[in-house]
A protein has these predicted regions:
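Conserved nucleotide-sugar donor-binding catalytic segment
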Residues: 1-110
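C-terminal subregions of glycosyltransferases and related glycan-biosynthesis enzymes
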Residues: 68-197
Length: 197
């Protein structure tokens, strides 16, 4: 679904560059050119911009067989790639109408890299931030509300389950906000999360 792809691009680059195929009637000009200010994340910046102009879709076929080697940008200049990818994410936060502080951006990056453990205080801060993103999108309707909410809930679940060393307090925080807690979470996942606490 194009709206699901669009919502996902708010959080991370989900488009595998070598597999992109454009229709011939795509608008021309600067809107379909790489922005040189995003050196190692030019593709992500382009997709994040284009997704607001055209529909993206997936073809359910394997189009590329990837051979990974030690000289890929991902391996040789990962730091730069992350830095420019973060610039794209900041730009998308601004598109929602949020003038985010450095601390907000740092928290946003930490949430997206959800293998980090959160303190109880930063977990509460993350909940406030995610709720803020949800509310701004609900007002501006830039991303499909259903898909955007699902992704917000997904990240909320990930960061809560990565912080289970704080026991039942984390489970209470997770369930404490109905807008963030995932009602469609299977009983199996809820039980596993509960037992981890």
């Amino acid at each position: 679904d194009p709206e699901e792809i669009k919502a996902n691009l708010f959080f991370r680059n989900i488009i595998f560059h070598p597999t992109v195929i454009f229709r011939k009637d795509l608008p021309s000009g600067d809107s379909v050119s790489y922005n040189e200010n995003y050196l190692r994340a030019q593709d992500y910046e382009l997709w994040a911009r284009l997704v607001h102009l055209i529909n993206f879709s997936n073809i359910n076929e394997v189009l590329v067989k990837l051979r990974s080697h030690k000289n890929t940008v991902y391996r040789t200049d990962r730091k730069s790639q992350v830095k420019y990818g973060d610039k794209v994410k900041t730009k998308q936060i601004q598109r929602l109408g949020i003038n985010a502080s450095r601390e907000n951006i740092r928290l946003h990056k930490k949430i997206l890299n959800s293998n980090h453990s959160f303190s109880l205080e930063s977990l509460n801060d993350a909940g406030v931030w995610l709720l803020n993103l949800l509310q701004y999108n609900n007002r501006r309707e830039i991303y499909d509300k259903y898909y955007f909410r699902n992704l917000i809930q997904h990240y909320w679940f990930l960061i809560c389950t990565s912080s289970t060393e704080y026991g039942m307090e984390v489970y209470k925080i997770f369930n404490g906000n109905e807008s963030l807690s995932t009602r469609n979470l299977s009983l199996n996942y809820k039980l596993r999360f509960f037992l981890k606490c």
